Amino acid sequence: MDVRQLRSLVTLVEVRFSVSRAAECLHLVQSAVTQHLKQLEAELGTRLFVRHGKRLVGLTEVGEQVLRHACEALRQTGNIVAVGREHLEEERRRIRLGATHTQARYVLPPVIRRFAAAYPAVELQIHQGTPGQLVD
């Protein structure tokens, strides 16, 4: 089971069981959505959909339960992605700079002041040491 299958299920229900509209919403071809749904049913070993001929017209009782869990799983997946993006944004706002003691004392102070004024959201971390220490 994967996120694509769960998204296909949730989207299908949102568009009232129209596979073509679900595919359009997901920017997929119809056969991909159909495949996701078949794979999901196969993995779970049960029917999730009420069918009228070949058409999907509703969810079975198990399908309703799976839908609730799928919605929660997708919400949690969104939270995980948000945490990752927040961390990435924090990393993008941090610059680590290595400098010798002389550079840190005499060269960098005016440069750091100008940089901090121009980019207040960026955190500068200055590490001082000998050239050999800074390589590590």
UniProtKB/Swiss-Prot annotation:
* Gene Ontology terms: biological process: cysteine biosynthetic process
| SUPFAM superfamilies xref list | Winged helix' DNA-binding domain (SSF46785)
User: Which keywords accompany this UniProt record?
Assistant: Activator, DNA-binding, Transcription, Transcription regulation
**UniProt keyword Transcription, yes or no:** yes
- Spell out the InterPro entries in the cross-references: LysR_subst-bd, Tscrpt_reg_HTH_LysR, WH-like_DNA-bd_sf, WH_DNA-bd_sf
Pfam families for the chain: HTH_1 (PF00126), LysR_substrate (PF03466)
Residue intervals of the HTH lysR-type domain: 1-59
Keyword Transcription regulation in annotation: yes
Protein family membership? Belongs to the LysR transcriptional regulatory family.
- Tell me the PANTHER family matching this sequence: HTH-TYPE TRANSCRIPTIONAL REGULATOR (PTHR30126), HTH-TYPE TRANSCRIPTIONAL REGULATOR CYSB-RELATED (PTHR30126:SF6)
Query: What protein name does the entry list?
Result: HTH-type transcriptional regulator CysB
**Taxonomy-wise, where does this protein's organism fall, top ranks first?**
Bacteria, Pseudomonadati, Pseudomonadota, Gammaproteobacteria, Chromatiales
Query: What gene name is listed for this protein?
Result: cysB
